[in-house]
Curated annotation (Swiss-Prot):
Residues 450-453 are annotated as: G4. PANTHER family: TR-TYPE G DOMAIN-CONTAINING PROTEIN, TRANSLATION INITIATION FACTOR IF-2-RELATED. Residues 486-488 are annotated as: G5. The keyword GTP-binding applies. This is Translation initiation factor IF-2. Residues 396-399 are annotated as: G3.
């Protein structure tokens, strides 16, 4: 191998070759100095040509010997590396080698052409003009280049542009050729065919004769760059082709899939695109063509437009009736077996009659001490265990007038009502209201006469008073059980429990257990650590952790956790069981129903349907807008804007109900926002924008929020008792009322003499009959019991002195701004005074 290397070097460097055209493989092995520094000339003798030819033959033989060794070594290394290459990389490498071979063939063709040109030129005419030779030389070079390019296109279509440019630069030969011999020079095709066969043979030998020890570092930097670019371009083309084929196959498969789309009454653009597995922008483009230009992904489409879009994308659709969906959900499980359930008992009565204390005595707890001032302001739900694994669910409702909605909610979910009446107070307004709720709900009732331990307790008086409201006790021949109890002394509590169980037995309370759960929301609130917390009572089915529930028209979610009345975590809740549920997205209203659905998608559809019904009901009950004439006729009415924040949703409803009853013709109360939770910065900013006050009931305000409210001059009022908030709202509204102004007659003047009457007014001499006259007082000029002038006393004098007032029994002179004729005999003057009366809303 070393010998072959030395032969190559000696062959390349021996002698001074002043003019030669080497093959590409020869040029790659020349040093950069020789390649760049040698200048060639065509004007040489025939002897020089022969010497050059002989040297060139030696060089070619040496180069061919060396190239065989190098090619064998390259083939070996190629085979060795091909084992670790992918098929695509091997193909790219083969293309690069083929491009290099084509370049070598081009060099050989140019060399043969150059030699022939030299011989013809030197034997014919050396003295031809330089300009003609250059012209003919360019024509010859162009034809040779065309032939080379055609040959290159026949062998491969991936020739590098850099290689072609290199060939064109090397083809700028300085030979002088006569135009008459050009056609003869380009004839020898046999030589080209032989060389092509030779290189094909060499290329085949590269694949099968691997030899080690010979370096393949025979390419210049330029050719290496060309080969690398060829490999990179081929890889890119293959990758792009692969991607395009993959995309075409994916799109073709996608277009073949036909989906069945469920279309509700209303659906958003985004939901419709998702159900069809289409892009949102494609659906928007289709709507744009239909004339819906400014439509967003969150905009709703009716079923007609949605069905047209589905058909345009070659899908099928089915219209869904959400009302039918809700009916089917509630009808689920009606044909299944009914099993006994625990009774739900609601404790009702007037405020301070001992309802919560009675429940504490039964549960052996102390809830009443936790209430502010001992007043219940929330609905509480508890379940107690009796002997024999029997359970009773109790619901404690507030007794204040403001909690009418809460009491109505309690009667809607209850089986039995325990009406608590204080033995010392007797029948009170909220007692009567509770009786009416019981009658409206058509539920059973037990009367518990509390506080019988007091000395002035009179049970017979209460029993007779109940007759006036249609409640007949068993002692009087009726069907209402009356139990005298004492929560404080724990008297007759067992008798009350037994009466409840007896009543439940008579009612034969049963429910389906093995079905989707449904029930009622008793109370709801926002907890800082847990989020939305809702107290539910299951009326049908079994509620499990992980179920998806829909509550009312604005709330749904997945049940993350459940807790019983004792605070222990529960996995399931059976009928008549109260639980606190975490996981809802919004705070539901008290008294709203809940039901378990199959999926979040179904939950959203049901919420959308209920929201639509709710909005339609609001529009139907909305008051008609007043036109400009009506507003002018009614006059300007002052408004008080309120932002209400409470601890639980039941309190929000109770306070809104109470303050809505505070009305006045000259002022209007607007509850701009009501919610559950602490006062936040957004509440303060809303109050600043709307000029509102913030009423906070049983909630706190952070220091940062207080500081912001102080900067914005926003008033935040905190309350713990519902009485206080109602009274305070009345005071605020009363302070906004303008005082009522009335005209009161404070004196009378009789006219004695008219001194003058002109443009400045009338000067009258008068006598104060009664009352008192003051300067600037309002006066009315009365003639024959008719008011002919109203004005003010501009000047008041006694004799020649200006005075501020004149009492009864004295004479005075006055100046009125009245220029018409006055008759002293019949005209009298009434002295008036405006008195303001402060109005109070009661």
């Amino acid at each position: 191998m070393n010998e072959s290397k030395s032969v190559v070097d000696s062959g390349l460097m021996s002698g001074k070759i002043e003019r030669t055209t080497l093959k590409l493989s020869d040029k790659l092995k020349l040093s950069s100095n020789i390649h760049q520094g040698t200048k060639f000339s065509l004007k040489k003798s025939v002897t020089t040509v022969e010497v050059r030819k002989s040297k060139k033959r030696k060089d070619i033989n040496n180069i061919e010997q060396a190239s065989v060794v190098l090619q064998n070594d390259n083939a070996y290394q190629d085979n060795e590396s091909n084992n670790s290459l992918t098929i695509q990389e091997q193909i790219s490498r083969m293309n690069a080698l083929q491009n290099a071979n084509i370049c070598e063939k081009k060099e050989d063709i140019k060399e043969d052409t150059s030699d022939v040109n030299l011989q013809v030129t030197e034997s014919t005419s050396v003295e031809k003009s330089e300009s003609d030779d250059v012209t003919l030389e360019e024509e010859s070079s162009k034809k040779v280049e065309e032939q080379v390019v055609e040959e290159a296109h026949d062998n491969t279509d991936t020739v590098s542009l850099n290689v072609v440019e290199n060939v064109q630069e090397e083809s700028q030969v300085d030979n002088q050729v006569e135009s008459s011999n050009i056609s003869d020079i380009l004839q020898p095709k046999g030589i080209e065919e032989k060389k092509l066969k030779k290189y094909e043979k060499e290329h085949e030998e590269k694949k099968g004769n691997p030899k080690k020890g010979v370096s393949n570092n025979m390419y210049s930097k330029h050719v290496k760059l060309v080969i690398e670019e060829e490999l990179e371009d081929n890889n890119k083309q293959v990758i792009q082709t692969h991607k395009s084929r993959k995309n075409r196959s994916t799109s073709s498969v996608k277009n073949k899939i036909t989906r069945k789309v469920l279309i509700p009454k209303k659906i958003t653009v985004q939901e419709l695109a998702s159900s069809m597995s289409e892009r949102v922008k494609d659906v928007q483009h289709m709507l744009f063509q239909m004339g819906r230009r400014d439509i967003k992904p969150t905009d709703f489409l009716d079923s007609d437009h949605a069905s047209v879009i589905v058909e345009a994308f070659n899908h099928t659709f089915k219209l869904v009736n959400d009302g039918k969906l809700e009916e089917d959900l509630y009808a689920d499980g009606n044909d299944k077996e009914l099993l006994p359930r625990a009774p739900v008992v609601t404790v009702m009565g007037h405020v301070d009659h001992g309802k919560t204390s009675l429940l504490d005595a039964i549960r052996k707890s102390n809830v009443a001490d936790g209430e502010f001032k001992g007043i219940t302001q929330h609905i509480g739900a508890y379940q107690i265990m009796l002997d024999g694994d029997k359970r009773i669910t109790f619901i404690d409702t507030p007794g204040h007038e403001a909690f009418t909605a809460m009491r109505a909610c309690g009667t809607n979910v209850t089986d039995i009502v325990v009406l608590v009446v204080a033995a010392d107070d007797g029948i009170m307004p909220q007692t009567i209201e509770s009786i009416n709720h019981v009658k409206a709900a058509n539920v059973a009732m037990i009367v518990a006469v509390n506080k019988i331990d007091k000395h002035d307790a009179n049970i017979d008086k209460i029993t007779n008073s109940l007759l006036n409201h249609g409640v007949v006790a068993e002692s009087l021949g009726g069907d209402v059980i009356v139990v005298p109890v004492s929560a404080k002394e724990r008297i007759n509590l067992d008798q009350l429990k037994s009466s409840i169980l007896l009543m439940a037995e008579l009612l034969e309370l049963k429910a389906v257990y093995d079905t989707r759960a449904s029930g009622v929301v008793i109370e709801s609130k926002v907890d800082r650590n847990c989020g939305v917390v809702a107290t539910l009572i299951v009326q049908k089915g079994t509620l499990k952790a992980g179920d998806i529930i829909v509550v009312g028209h604005n709330s749904y979610g997945k049940v993350r956790n459940m807790f019983n009345s004792d605070g222990r975590s529960e996995k399931v809740a059976i009928p008549s069981m109260p639980v606190k549920v975490l996981g809802l997205n919004n705070v539901p209203n008290s008294g709203t129903n809940f039901i378990v659905v199959d999926s979040e998608k179904q939950a959203r559809e049901l919420i959308s349907y209920r929201q639509e019904l709710f909005n339609a009901e609001l529009e139907a009950n909305a008051k008609p807008k007043m036109d400009a004439n009506s507003i002018l006729a009614c006059g300007v009415v002052d408004e008080l804007n309120v932002i209400l924040k409470c601890d639980v949703m039941g309190s929000v409803e109770a306070i809104c109900y109470s303050i809505s009853k505070i009305t006045h013709e000259d002022i209007k109360l607007n509850v701009l926002y009501k919610g559950v939770g602490n006062v936040t910065k957004s509440d303060v900013l809303l109050a600043e924008t709307s000029n509102s006050i913030i009423l906070a009931f049983n909630v706190k305000t952070d220091a940062s929020v207080k500081e912001l409210a102080k900067q914005k001059c926003i008033e935040i009022k905190h309350y713990s008792v519902i009485y206080d908030i109602i009274d305070d709202v009345k005071k605020i509204l009363s302070s906004m009322l303008k005082p009522l102004q009335q005209e009161v007659q404070v004196g009378t003047l009789s006219i004695r003499k008219v001194f003058s009457s002109g443009s400045i007014g009338s000067v009258l001499g008068c006598y104060v009959t009664n009352g008192i006259v003051r300067k600037g007082a309002l006066v009315k000029l009365i003639r024959n019991n008719n008011v002919i002038h109203e004005g003010k006393i501009k000047v008041l004098r006694r004799f020649k002195d200006d005075v501020k007032e004149v009492a009864a029994g004295f004479e005075c002179g006055i100046l009125l701004d009245y220029s018409k004729e006055i008759y002293p005999e019949s005209d009298i003057i009434h002295i008036l005074e405006i008195v303001e009366e402060i109005r109070v809303i009661k």
